[in-house]
Amino acid sequence: MNKALIITPTGRPIYHHEDYDKDNHWRFTKPERTYETCVVVYNDFQPEPGTYDYIIRRKGLKWNLAPEVSKIINWQDYDYIGVWDDDYATDIKSVNLALSYARRYDFRLFQQATTSFQTYDCLKHNPEFAFTETNFIELGVPFFRNDIYRKVLRFLDAYKYEASDWGIDKVLCFYLQASAHVVHDCTVRHML
């Protein structure tokens, strides 16, 4: 098991940004990826060909969809599971690099550093570091180690998520009893 899975509720065309290779958007299904992508289409949108390995059609909020999708996709076969919003830009090389750090240093949960203007200081890209340890990651583009994802699913089964502003990200590390990491050698950008 050395492949990750990104589950991404999707309802719009992919976003590109000049900082990333537009021919290698993170959702493109190219052979050099060390991950697969499952798009969960929440409206009538038809995802671009070659931008997903699996497609599921379901309506709902991302954190309510994650447990449903996890009953359909065999997530246990993956070493890391990401649950990403569809409005982020990065590329395959960046995601692969972040996953290589996670695998080498056994991260429990992590994300790539952000270059977005609206972000928390601890998540902002800092080229002085390869990665940093923190007690917080924003839940727009998180990755969870397989055993940690199991705990996230238990949390989501016990809590009925009803709004995007609840602040799960502020308590998740405490609940999981795990530190988080921000990989600064690669970045991601929130486009909205």
Give the predicted meaning of each segment:
Residues 83, 109-112, 180-184:
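A structural signal for short, well-ordered beta-strand segments and their strand-loop junctions
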Residues 80, 91-174:
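Conserved catalytic core of nucleotide-sugar-dependent glycosyltransferases
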Residues 14-16, 88-91:
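Acidic-and-aromatic substrate-binding clefts and catalytic sites of carbohydrate-active enzymes
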Residues 77-89:
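Short beta-strand-to-loop acidic/aromatic patch adjacent to the donor-nucleotide binding site
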Residues 1-4, 61-62, 70, 75-76, ...:
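Catalytic phosphate/metal-binding cores of nucleic-acid and nucleotide-processing enzymes, i.e., regions
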